[in-house]
A protein has these predicted regions:
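Conserved "HGTGT" condensation-loop signature of ketosynthase/thiolase-family condensing enzymes
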Residues: 1-132
Length: 132
C-alpha cells in the first residue's frame, strides 16, 4: 500500500498522469514478497506497459546510497534515450505483471519515477522530467 500511496501522491504533486511517465525505476529488492507488493502497486497505477528497470540488478542493495545511484542511472538513460536492461531477469513471475526491461533498446521516455522503500515500511517516490 505504501508504494501505491507515494506513486499517486507524486503524480498528483507533479500534475501528471501515469501515461506521462516514460519509465519506472523500481526499488527491486529481489525478494518474492517485496517485489510482488511493488509490482502490484505499479500495475494498479501504470498497468503493464510502462517499462520498469532496476539498477540493483547490477550492484545489489547499496542501502542509503541506492536512491542516488538509481536516479543517476535513470538520468543517464534519459540522456542516452534508451534504458539499460535488468540483469538476471529471465523468467517473468506471473504474480508480477509489469514490463521489466531486459533489453538495451527500450526507449527511456522523457520522464521517470524512482521508487524506494525502507525496511520499516516507508516508501518514497520522485518524478524527474526532462526539460526537452
Amino acid at each position: 500500500q505504501a508504494f501505491e500511496n507515494v506513486i499517486k501522491q507524486s503524480l498528483a504533486n507533479a500534475n501528471l498522469q501515469p501515461t506521462d511517465i516514460g519509465h519506472i525505476h523500481g526499488h527491486g529488492m529481489s525478494t518474492i514478497s517485496a517485489d510482488r507488493g511493488e509490482a502490484v502497486a505499479i500495475n494498479k497505477i501504470f498497468g503493464n506497459q510502462t517499462p520498469v528497470v532496476a539498477a540493483k540488478s547490477y550492484m545489489g542493495n547499496l542501502g542509503a546510497g541506492s536512491g542516488s545511484v538509481e536516479i543517476i542511472s535513470s538520468l543517464l538513460a534519459l540522456d542516452k534515450g534508451t534504458l539499460f536492461k535488468t540483469l538476471n531477469y529471465d523468467t517473468p513471475d506471473p504474480d508480477c505483471d509489469i514490463q521489466v526491461t531486459n533489453s538495451i533498446d527500450t526507449p527511456a521516455g522523457s520522464s521517470f519515477i524512482n521508487l524506494n522503500a525502507s525496511p520499516q515500511g516507508q516508501a518514497s517516490a520522485v518524478i524527474i522530467k526532462s526539460l526537452q
